[in-house]
Amino acid sequence: MNTQSTHALAVASALAALLGVAACSKDKSIDQPAKLTPLTASLRVQRVWTASVDDKRAVALRLGLGLSVAGNRVYAAGHRGDIVAIDVASGRILWRARTRAPLSGGTAASAELVLVGSSDGQLFALNPADGAIRWKVRLNGEVLAPAAIAERLIAVRTVDGKLHALSPSDGHELWSQEQQVPRLSLRGTARPVIAGDLVLCGFDNGKVLAANTNDGSVQWEATITPPHGRTELERLADIDSSVRVSGGDVFTVGFQGRVAMLALETGQIWWSHEASSFRGLTLDDDALYVATADGELVALKARTGAEIWRQKALLHRGLSAPATMETAVVTADFQGYVHWLDKASGALAARASTGKVRISTAPVVVGNMVLVINDRGRISAFRVTPLTRPAGAGRKTVPETPAPQPEESK
């Protein structure tokens, strides 16, 4: 049996075990998604356009098909094989490319390339101007996260534990690194990050690795989340989200593990705190924001890890990784809601519905606009402005769809 098949079976077994635990006893309550209640908005949110990369028949799949922006264009991909370029201001589709591949990891974009990976191990490189395919290569493993693009190399993770460095000109492999994949892991991989002469990436074994961009030699590796526990479920320690780099510091978070700050040059851990996340974190000014596995949004001081605030109003709503605006943090949930929180206090500041389909990937912020794509490939763009009102006046935002039902997956 090949590595991919073994990994797929392991993931399926984990899901079956988790479902079995949830269903085996009527005495044990299943965590219910928090109900959305009316709020007093401090931001005005206006939907300005929508577009779709897939048709209405597309199945909602939790894949790593997020949005990317380069210049005045946003790029999106759908599992059925289409890739589109959209004008950010108007929502007009500028071109559509058809790969006929089961796309599963992307998009990544620069001024020179648009990259998307597939579940059958292909990586496509397109011309941003017209969507023409410049080259494609076949990797040995499924691609579940966007690639990273730099002038001299492309870095991409595959589900078999490998980090590949490819030439931007034709996709030929420059070097690769590999980490052992545990017998059981979450379905997902971390997006690599290129910082100077280092490629950084998290792995399913709870480690972050830094490799030299020139030859792939390992500069350091750090164990963020040591696997612990008796069962394989308890020992899950995946780092499935991108690390964040600020100056000489690296920030990362793992599942059933820790959020930590490391030194970029050496990998030394400066501080760490218990946390569990498979969606990830974002960094802004002097704070980082983490979407936890159980649906809390937590703000921490970047230098010390001290908690600034913790918002529990969105518990068990399957939050996406957060993004930041000037005064707000934005995340999305399993029912297609987009939530804005005040950056200073964590208070809910606004809410908008995109429909009833989950949003798995992080919102993308472009100036005062927020772009999201749901798991069926529908893209929504919102313009966000401060809400001015007389003292004592308030504007209520009421949920537009019914409260979630127990049988909905989180």
Where are these regions (language model features)?
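Bacterial N-terminal signal peptides
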Residues: 12-20
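Bacterial Sec signal peptide processing site at the extreme N-terminus
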Residues: 20-40
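Extracytoplasmic beta-rich repeat domains
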Residues: 28, 42-68, 95-110, 133-150, ...
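Structural signature of WD-repeat beta-propellers
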Residues: 78, 118, 158, 203-204, ...
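Short loop/turn segments that connect beta-strands within beta-propeller blades
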Residues: 87-90, 127-130, 167-170, 213-216, ...
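Loop/turn-rich, solvent-exposed surfaces of beta-rich toroidal or solenoidal domains
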Residues: 289-299, 306-340
